[in-house]
Amino acid sequence: MKNMMKKYYELQNLNDKEKMDYFRAVYPNLNDNIIYYFLVRHLGTEFVYEEFSQLNLSKCYVEELELSNNQIFEIEYADFCSFKNETVQYYNILNEVAPNYFITGTWTGPILTTPRNNKLVAIDGNNRLRMLRCYLKHTNMPICDKHRIYVIRQND
């Protein structure tokens, strides 16, 4: 990930489809959801690359896990994440910004994590993680027992 900012300047004028095609070719080991949400949408987001610079994405694999409601609260936010508001006031706007919670009982977009210091840390989806926690804390609507997250691990 150390060279991602250099690559940003080469890719910044491409549309999302062209960026997807590029990243699919470079990282065939990553699925489309991870490529889109993590690489295409965050292309040029320097603080993401700095915090997780130890990852060599070409040597990583992605594992899908289902976590319980309690386990969702054990995931740490990335250091760069400054907005961690999980209050009822924030929950009250979820109906407008994330209505899929009320249909599915979980978040349907990917939350990408990686192990650090024996904990999972959100690389991508910090806001989705916050909204999911908000929903779990404050809703009277149905809640799923399990929530899908992704863990990116580096092969040794």
What are these language model-derived features?
Residues M1-R24, R116-D156:
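Basic- and aromatic-enriched surface patches that contact anionic nucleotides/nucleic acids
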Residues K19, R24, I35, K59, ...:
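Low-complexity, compositionally biased segments
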Residues M5-K6, S58-I123, C134, N140:
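Short alpha-helix boundary/capping and kink motifs at helix termini
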Residues V48, S53, E74, C81-K84, ...:
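Compositionally biased, low-structure terminal segments
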